[in-house]
Amino acid sequence: GHASIRSQASSRIFIGKVTENSNGYTLRKGEGESTLMEYKTNVGQYHACGVSKQSMGAVIWNVRWGDDSCFESHATQPRATLIDCCSGGFMHWRQGGDSAQMPNHMENLTIWNFYATNAQTDQDIDTEGKFTWWDGNGFWWKFMPPIIVGFHGSPLDFDDTQMKRLESNGTAVEPYSLYEAQLRKRLGYVPSWLSSLK
């Protein structure tokens, strides 16, 4: 398959407790059948759960996607997305988007306590092996500086000059879920519908 669940041109969407673990071929950068590599279990959709078009205020919560995938951020100006306590692959080039519709994501992409089961950089754009968010030499890889807190699992270094905030890289933080903590602060409790999804 090509894509999982996404918030497309919508506002205040919650996508939670989704598990996507399809089998298939791992991919390398390129076009056509030459990109297919090895057949494996739990590869996942090319684009995992995420956002597209003018999505605003989406929460992707407690989602598990495949090891050769990554969250979707399919351009045309999505903004203010929280990827909260999710796990799966963190692979370059899986976000998507037409070169005429860049950037992949505008302001306020927040990735909180992400557990990477597999991480990949791209030697063509990642200086010194550090994950790059804005490729100044290409057309397809453009993210405004994100906020990443508590990234852990497979190690990955990020280019500090392209980050709005980077904290606790390599170690999960408390609260484990930023979304739950915000609800608790605003409402005084975590709604039962959310607790039932744990």
Language model region names:
Residues W61-R64, D68, R79, D84-K198:
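Catalytic domains of carbohydrate-active enzymes that cleave complex glycans
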Residues G1, A9-G24, E31-Y46, K53-S69, ...:
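Right-handed parallel beta-helix
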Residues Y25-G44, E128-K130, N137-W140, N169-G170:
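Intrinsically disordered, low-complexity coil segments
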